[in-house]
Swiss-Prot record:
SUPFAM superfamilies: F-box domain (SSF81383). This is Putative F-box protein At1g57580. It comes from the Eukaryota. PROSITE patterns: FBOX. Residues 1-49 form the F-box domain. InterPro entries: F-box-like_dom_sf, F-box_dom, SCF_F-box_component.
Amino acid sequence: MDTLPHHLLDEILFRIDHRSLAMIQCTNRSLQSHISKTPNFASEYFSRIRSSLLYIATHGCPLICYHLYGDSRSPRTVETLTQCHILGYCSGLLLLFLNKNLCVANPLTKKFRFLNHSRSKFFPTDFTLRGGRQQVIGFAVDQTDRTTPSFKIVNIKEGAVHWLRNDGSIVAFNLKTEKARLIPIRFPKELCLKTLFTAVDNNLTLISATEEVIYVYAFHNILSDPKWVLVKQIRNGVLDEKRLYSWYVEAYDGKSLVLRETILKKDYYNKHLKQVLHGYDLRANKWEVIGSIPEWSPSGLDFYQFTPSPSSVIGLDDKEGEEILACDDKRIPSVNAIMRLIYGIS
C-alpha cells in the first residue's frame, strides 16, 4: 500500500472501521506516519463513518449494550460495577451518572473527568434520575470558537434550551439573558403518533412515522417565520406485519435512522417477544438489520447514535490537576469498562 497515491490510500483507510484503523497504526509505522502527517485526516475520517448504537435501560442499569456499525452480530455488552445512567451524548463525548458521580468521557482519546455537581439541584440523589429527571438534562459541545471548544451540560440551539410542548409550540430559554420565549409553531398536518424530536448538526429535527412512510422535518426560520419543512420521506418497509407487536423510531442523526421493532414469536409451548433493530442509511437509501436486542433487556431503553471524535475539549483534555485520569486508572473501573466496550480492541 506504500506505493499507492495518497488520495487512493486515504479512500481505502476511510472505509476501515475505527478499531481496525487503530490496530493498523499499531502494526504499520508507514501508515501511522501517513495518518498523523496528513492534514485533516482525522476530521475527514470521522465525518464519513456511520454512527454505532449505544443503549441502556432508561432508569439506569449496570449493563450497557453496544452495536458496532456494519456488524449485525449480537451486541457487545459490559457490566459496570455500579449503577449507570447515560444522560447524553455529543461530539464523541458521553455524559455519565455513576453511583451519584457525574462524569464526561471520550472513549476514543481515553480521557474522562468527574464533575463537581454539589450545587446542582438536578443530582441530589440517584432517586431523582429514576423519576424521569434526566429528561430535562441536555448535553452539548459549544463550538462557537473552533479553537477552544468546551462542553456544557445543556442542550444548546442558538444560545437557548428548547422544549417541545404538547400543542407543537416550542419554549426557548436563553442561557445568557435567562429569559424564555414562546415560538408559536404547530405540528405538521401529517403528524403521526410515532414521533421523535431531536437535533441534527445543531438544527432542530422532527421525525413523524407511520407503518408505511417516515417523514423527516427540519425547523426553519426560527427567529422570523418559524415552520417545519419536510426534507425527506423514507419508505417504512421493514415491519413484519403478521407478527408485529409494537415499533418505535428510536434515533436519528442525519446519516442514519434507527427503528426498533418488537415481534411476537410463537413456538409449540409458549409465546415470547423479540426486539429487532433496523437501520436506514440515508446515503445509500436502504434499510438493513442492525441486530437484535438481548431478551433480558427491559422494554424501556435509551438509544444513542455514537460517533467517536478525536477533537480536544476544554475541561476534558486539560492536563492540569488530578481530575483527569489515565484510562487504565484502577480507581474508576466502571468508566474504564464503558470506554473499552466502545473502543476496546478484542
